[in-house]
Amino acid sequence: MATKLYPIGMQTFSEIREEDFLYVDKTEFIYRMTHTSGKYFFLNRPRRFGKSLLVSTMQSYFEGKKELFKGLAIEKLEKDWTEYPVLHFSLAGGKHMEKDQLVRYLLYILKVNEEKFGIVNDSPDPNVRMLNLIKTVYEQTGQKVVVLIDEYDAPLLDVVHEDTSLGVLREVMRNFYSPLKDSDRMLRFVFLTGITKFSQLSIFSELNNITNVSMDTEYAGICGITKEELVTEMHEDIQQMADVLGLSYDKTLEKLKENYDGYHFAWPSSDIFNPYSLLTCFSKRKVDSYWFGSGTPTYLLNMMRKYDFTPIDLGEQMDASKDDFDAATETMTTIMPLLYQSGYITIKNYDPETELYTLALPNKEVRIGLFRSMLPHYLAAKSAMCNTTVAKMSSLINKGNMDGALQLLKTFWETVPYCDNTDYEGHYQQTMYIIFALLTNFRILVEQHTFRGRTDITMETKDTIYVIELKFNKSAQEALDQINNKHYADAFALRDKTVEKIGMNFMIDEDKAIVLDWLKFGE
């Protein structure tokens, strides 16, 4: 039973503070941002990373609700606590809509804000309504207006891969945001959040002075939970988790890091934990996959197919310039910007000499979630059975019984229906990579470079390195011969582990069944 109240899924700052839920203090970031020379700010972070709570915290701050900030950093920093009128728009409800539906939704959220200030306006044009709302509130209160826009890109995410629909909905949103430029003298602060980055020209029209703080080191920890925050503010939670798991404090922290840590949105940056997964883990007292299971990234899988981005590509580290991944998604020529901005890959290193960033999957939760979501694309209806097979294989490999694990795999493949579009070696290599990548207890490398070529799959356990070569409609002996003739195993000769060489071959028999055969060196 959880002894602390965790704000899982909660987005309202006042509710969290008034009902004594855990709050990780981000108010120093808010003070810093609201006391610079800028007026327009943009931040993108992955879903469920605390963006909406950040916006709600800003709203309470600008509304002068000092009592909610007792004991927080901003209590000592802010002296005036001036109350400003706040317009808060959430576009979260604008998903899966056609043009007319989206316009009606925009009119609805405008009406909610109008009613807050006793304003009546029946114009059918969101542009006119927004401009009038800001002007009237400014004149009515005598104070400059604060505009907070949460999930600004929500109406566009589902159609980011559809050029026609994207253009239509993008124009609707441009029309909605355009009054911000004309209202400049009446605005105190404007803050927009979202998952992805759309170009200023396409969305914000003439609003060319917006400051994007998404990759600024000073704001790297504005969302999410840093390691420092975890070990200082949730020390007891880690210890309680350790007691449940039967592990030491340090081993439990290591397990939490392995599953939920690893994000960096700037470099240098503290390690950032996924807040939704971490808090859900503490609440349930169970290490599991929470973030990925909270929303199926259909649009992401669609884009991966569009850009021919494979599981092997996803599993490898990528070197890229900032412009390659911190780019507008609607003009991207690779999947990298969407993967990065959605939180499926993250910054792992930076080389100041080349100005190249190294990006990779952040942690175990994301890796397993992504690969599991890909299984239906490669195995159709058999993906659920594959998860069971993988779990059993992992147990056998841990016991050193690779033959038993491969026999399970052979039996599984015999249940997979043959399709003409899978009649090539690459399909089986990609599928096998997913299967092996789901063996989470082991280190898996695909097409690892050696001085004589590249191995198809290398798997490393605590005491054994398996060098695996795959063939299609050839023979396991031919695969094994390639390992030997090209001396793939020599790359591991100095490692203090047993090296086993395995040749595998897939064949389609006369009954259109998929048959897996394998041969180990020395047998």
Predicted features by range, described:
Residues V146, T464-Y466, E500:
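Structural motif
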Residues F176-S183, P337-I345, T431-A437, Q482-I502:
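Metal-dependent nuclease catalytic cores in nucleic-acid-processing enzymes
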Residues M432, T455-F472, K486:
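Conserved catalytic cores of phosphodiester-cleaving nucleases, focusing on short active-site segments
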Residues G167-E171, F472-A489:
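Mg2+/Mn2+-dependent nuclease catalytic core
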Residues M1-Y424, L439-T440:
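Phosphate-binding site recognition
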Residues A491, K497-E523:
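Domain-level recognition of nuclease-like catalytic cores that cleave nucleotide substrates
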Residues T136-T141, I435-K462:
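Active-site metal-binding core of divalent-cation-utilizing nuclease and nuclease-like domains
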